[in-house]
Amino acid sequence: MREYTYAWNPIDYDDESQPILKITKSSFGSFQWCPQKYFFQYPLRMPIDQSPAMAKGSIVHNSQEDFFNTFDIKKAESMSPSEVKSYCMSLFPVDDHVDMYDTMATTATQRFVEARDEGRLSEYLPPGNEVMLDAEIVIQPDWNPKAELSRPYRVHIQGIIDRIFQEDDFYIPMELKTGPWKDYKRTMMRKEMAFYKLLFDNSSPDVLRENGLNPEYDMKYWGWYYPASNYT
């Protein structure tokens, strides 16, 4: 792979020693929201203030990652549903987001009990927990009829997938969001998950194996979880 950067120069594209454009899910979303904001935040790397919502998102995301890294299936296997719920709550920190953790623990308990009843505990923990993937794709000139290119461009895409669950011989990426669910977010979420699908499909087998994933498996479905609204 070539080096990559947000601050690329298309004039240097044919020079193999120069970096190509880097696109992440976040930078793509920022550009769609406001191209000028994207330019300040990514190519210029201007710092932005962290809002309370951003801080909350980081804390809860880290807590969910730690939850799946710590959860012991053998320990919970013989527990009653109420005991599983208490166990799940014990894996979350005690901070200002306890109400959200309670919802997340309830969801985790329901998933565990259902998996146990169906004999699918081997699929309870995600094989991918905060997985960062890298790939290269070629943008064809006619992909966007509103902004046709004069030539194809190879770009580097990168993203961190919150969770990748497995069901039989396929994967299901699941995105965690800490804000409230609104119906207008559905289009945005589909774009985010489609980005992950594109990233997964174009990652090399070696990259997938390094992240504990089977390159022979496909992503057939996707989902998102908004615990603030108890919406999946």
Task: Put a short name on every predicted segment.
Residues 131-232:
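Mg2+/Mn2+-dependent nuclease catalytic core
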Residues 23-26, 35, 123-130, 134, ...:
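Sequence-level motif detector for i,i+2 pairs with an aromatic at +2
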